[in-house]
Amino acid sequence: LTDKTLHDGYIEYTLLYDMIANRITIDEVKAENGGLRLMKNLTWEYDALPHALICGGTGGGKTYFLLTIIEALLQTNAQLFILDPKNADLADLGTVMDNVYHTKEDMIECVNAFYEGMVQRSEEMKHHPDYKTGENYAYLGLPPCFLIFDEYVAFLEMLGTKESMSLLSQLKKIVMLGRQA
């Protein structure tokens, strides 16, 4: 699904077609101007739509897709925070980059710190001399920040009810601040 248009009395859905012909190689996946080119005819405009959910069946390529996104974002000034509760493929990135977490305590601390950082950044943006209502971090020349959470549902299952609710609350707040900060 690439677009959904509400018309008088019906909804028009636009679907992506001919995916194989429109594929690009991993080295062609580029992050530029607030967007990430994923296919010849598909760009994720993360400045405008900052949230992404990647899902698929076991062995469907989700982890390689995430690694491709991470590799492209590392070529920019983006700040990445990666959480891998299964201590699997994404956790291995901790040997070559900072801000990669896999233990319960470190992951919870990262989510909390990420939220606090967004709140602080939002306040700093409001005091920036070029601040303008309705604009986001990119307007002020700030780097994008990404919280990449692999298998977050599996992580929630590892937590007790109180911890799980607290983490979900923080994630909801992060989503709310998403595009602005």
Q: Language-model segments: which ranges?
A:
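P-loop NTPase catalytic phosphate-binding loop
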Residues: 14, 18-126, 143-146, 152-181
